[in-house]
Amino acid sequence: MKKQTLHSPSYFVSGGKNPESLFAWKNVNCEIRNRKGEVFFEMKNVEAPEGWSQLAIDIAASKYFRKVGVPKTGHETSVRQMVDRVVKAIVASAIRQGGYFATRKEADIFAKELKFILLSQRGAFNSPVWFNAGLWEAYKAQSPSEHFAWDEKKKSIQATKNAYERPQCSACFIQSVDDSIESIFDLAKTEAKLFKYGSGTGSNFSKIRSKYEATGSGGKSSGLISFLEVLDKGAGAIKSGGTTRRAAKMVVVDIDHPEVLDFIDWKMREEQKAHLLIAAGLSADFEGEAYRTVSGQNANNSVRVSDAFMKAVEQERPWKLKARLTGKVLREIPAGEVWNRITRAAWMCADPGIQFHDTINKWHTCPETDIIHSSNPCSEYMFLDDSACNLASINLVKFLNDTGDFDFESFIHTARTLFVAQEILVDYSSYPTQRVAQNSHDYRPLGLGFANLGSLLMRKGVAYDSDEGRAWAGALTSLMSGVAYLTSSEMARAKGPFAGYRKNSKSMLKVMKMHERALNQVAWKMLPAGIDKAVRNLWKGVLYNGEKYGYRNAQATVIAPTGTIGLLMDCDTTGIEPDFSLIKFKKLVGGGEIQIVNQSVDAALASLQYFEDERQAILKYVEENNSVVGAPQMHPEDLPVFDTATAMPGQRVLSPESHVKMMAAVQPFISGAISKTVNMPSTATEEDISRIYFLAWKLGVKAVAVYRDGSKQSQPLNLKEKPKVVEEVGVPNFTMKCPECGSDTVLTSGCYRCPNCGTTVGCS
C-alpha cells in the first residue's frame, strides 16, 4: 500500500497571502540596563509586529537574533528575519527528508501557517531552535562540529562537520554515565558540547561506586560526591548558547545509594560555606569568589525514590543502602532518618527535589527498551538514557476571543502545526554523541506543552485553586496530548512508526489507554458544552490509529518552564504556574519601566461582569495595595480568582496544596512530567514540606520540588543588605539577582528568570 503524506490545511493564512502582511509592523530601539544603570545591551531600529511588547522585542534581539555574519547589517535586525530563517530551515529539511508533504504547495501552506503562529506569539520553539536553526541556510554560518546526525541517503548516523548545517535544536537531554573514569569524563565532554549550544542535560549517577566500596585494584573508590564536584565545576565555567544563560544540568541519585545522605546534604552544606565567606567580606555575586570556591551550585539535584521507600517511611521501617556492583547491603538505617534529611535540606535551600521512580515508569511507553532513570534539568522530560527532546510551547491566552471564550479549533490547529514542525526537527538536528543521535532517530520523543495557564484562568474569572480551574487545566492538557498523539499516528501512517515501536507496541498502547481512562477524572460539567465528547472522540482516534499504524513518536508532551520563550511570547505566567503578583513592571520604549496592574486583573473583572466604574475603582486600589482584599465594590466570593503564588504578609496567597493539586490534574495527560515549583511561605516547617511531598506521591505526580520563601541560598545571589544571621540555621538572608544584568529574578517553574534581560538559570 502506498504511504500517505500529511495534509497541511490553510487556517490562519488564506487566499495566497503572506503571513507577514497580516501584521502591522513597528521599529523600536532596544536597550537593556544593568542594576548600575549602565547599558547592558543595545540595538537600534529593530523591526517587530505591532502587538509585541518592548520586553518581548528586547528578548528576541538580545537572546535570539544572530549577532555576526548577516549580510549588509552584520546582525539580524528584525523578528521577521528570525522567524523566516527558522521556518525556512524546517520546511527545507522536511522536503529533503520526504513523506511530510505531498507537494511543494502543501509545504508552502505549512510554512505560512507556522510563520503566523510564531509571529502572533501563539507558540514558540525552545531556545536552541532560535539560537541555531537556519543559520547555515540563511547566512552560511560555520563552526567546527563533533556532533552526529541521521544521514537520509546513507540511512545511518554520521559525524557532522559543521555545527550549523545540522544544528543542535533540542533543549533537553538525558545521558547515561557508568562506573568508570572513561565514562565520567566522556560525560564531562558531552555536557560541555550541549551547554555550548544552549541545551541542558541530566544524568542518574547511581552506578558510580561509593566511597565505601573498593576499586578494581583493591583500593578505595573516590566516591560519588568527588566526581560530582568535578562535573559541577565544568558546568560552572560554561554559559549556554555563548552568552545567553548559564549551563543547566540535573543530578539524580537513587535512594539506595550508599552516599545518598551526603548527596542530600551536599548543596546545603556548600551554601553554608559560601555564606561564611560572604559574611567575611567576599563578593556575594554568583560569579564572585565565594561561590567559585564552593561546589554544588551549578545543577538541580533530585533524589530518585521508589514506592517501597515511601512505604518504609510511612511504616517506620529500616532502609537498605546497597553496594553498586554487588548489591550487597552496606548499611541499614531508618527510612525516616533519610526522609528527614531530605525535608531538612529542602527547607534550608530548596534542594533536593524528588522524583517518584515507580510512578514515572508506570507511564513509560518503552519499558522493553529500558526503564527511565533520570530527567532533564527542569524535570519535565523523562525518558530513556542517551536521548533528546525538542520542546515547543503554546501560549494559551492567545486563544481567548473578544468574548472571553476559548477558541478550541485554532488551538487544535496550532498544536498540530507545532508538533509536525517538532517532528521534522528530529532528523534535521545533530546530537553530541552517536548513541544520543541514534536513540533520537529511533524513538523521536517530542515535548509539546503550553504556557500562561495561570493568566488564562484569571482572565476567565476562574480561581486557580478550584475544581473548575483544575477541570480547565486537565481538559486543555488532554486535548493537546490527544492532538499530538493523533498527529503522531498520522505521521506513522505516512513515514512509519518510530523504530523502537514494534518492541514496545503493547506497552505504548497500554499507556495510551491509561491516558484515555484518565479523562474520567476531569469535571467536564464545569466546562463548555460539547468539549467532553470532542476530547473523548479524539482519544478514540488516537487508539484506533495507534493500533492500525503505530506512532511516529515515543513521547509527545511535557510541561516545560518556558523561561525565556515565555517572555518572547509575552506570557504573564509560565508553564502551569499561577500568577506571581497582581502588580507587573512594563518596559518602556528606549529603556526604563513603569509599575502597572497585571492585565489579567481587568480581564477577570470583565469576565466576572463588573461594571466599568467598579473595575476602575478596583484597579486603582490594586495599584496602591497589590491586593484586591478591601477593594471597593469587590465581591467576597470573587476573591479566590485573584489569589497568587506570593503575597505580602497577611494577604491572600495560594496554598502549597493548590500547586500540587494542579499538577495532579494535568499529569495523567502528559507523556513526560511538569516543571513546577511548589511555593511555600517562610513560616513553613519541615513537616509541611514532608506533607507536600507525600501528597504529590499519592496524587500520582512524577516529580516535585518546593521553594520556601527566603530559603534559597544557591544560584545567582547578592546580599540585599548586611547579613542577618538566622540563629537556627546560621546563614544570612539573601535576595536573588540575575548573573547577567544584576536585576532581581523571579523563581517560577523551578527556574530563576530575569524579567529585565530574559536570562534564565536552571531552565532549558
From Swiss-Prot:
One of its GO terms (biological process) is DNA biosynthetic process. It catalyses: a 2'-deoxyribonucleoside 5'-diphosphate + [thioredoxin]-disulfide + H2O = a ribonucleoside 5'-diphosphate + [thioredoxin]-dithiol. 5'-deoxyadenosylcobalamine (coenzyme B12). Its EC number is 1.17.4.1. Substrate binds at S127, A171, C172, G200, N376, P377, C378, S379, E380, P561, T562, G563, T564, I565. Its cofactor is adenosylcob(III)alamin. Catalyzes the reduction of ribonucleotides to deoxyribonucleotides. May function to provide a pool of deoxyribonucleotide precursors for DNA repair during oxygen limitation and/or for immediate growth after restoration of oxygen. This is Vitamin B12-dependent ribonucleotide reductase. It comes from Bdellovibrio bacteriovorus (strain ATCC 15356 / DSM 50701 / NCIMB 9529 / HD100).
